[in-house]
Amino acid sequence: GELDTLLRPFGLTFARYEALVLLSFSRAGALPLRLIGERLMVHPTSVTNTIDRLEHAGLVVRKPNPQDRRGTLAEITPAGRAVVVQATEVLMTAEFGLRGYQDDQLCAMFSLLRTLRVEAGDFTE
């Protein structure tokens, strides 16, 4: 799609971008792979593949989870943080692919998604 095309110069797909953004927003810049899957609502295999590619590109590193010896953390690197900033600027310029919608359509989508996120506990009203 349009977003993947915009992200291609950064070596990213939208799924990889989402994972990097999630890591960049986390307090420590690192999250367990399991939690990444839960937050992005994707299968563990997809998380593994995404982190593999981001790690290969030098945008994240894997580390043992000090809270769970069986688990692994993905941690964003300085290069990963730089790519998030640059890619976000490009996506913002393209209005995240939402240019074709009228204001009333955007408001309806925002309202619906806000309700879903409040119910999911992402934030309070």
Q: How would you name each of these model-derived features?
A:
Residues G1-L6, R39, A82, Q86, ...:
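Solvent-exposed, charged/polar functional surfaces in cytosolic regulatory/catalytic domains
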Residues E2-H43:
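N-terminal helix-turn-helix DNA-binding core of bacterial DNA-binding proteins
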Residues L20-L23, L33, L40, L54, ...:
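Generic leucine side-chain signal with a strong bias for well-ordered alpha-helical environments
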Residues I51-S111:
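Charged, amphipathic alpha-helical coiled-coil/dimerization segments
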Residues D104-E125:
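C-terminal regulatory/oligomerization modules of transcriptional regulators
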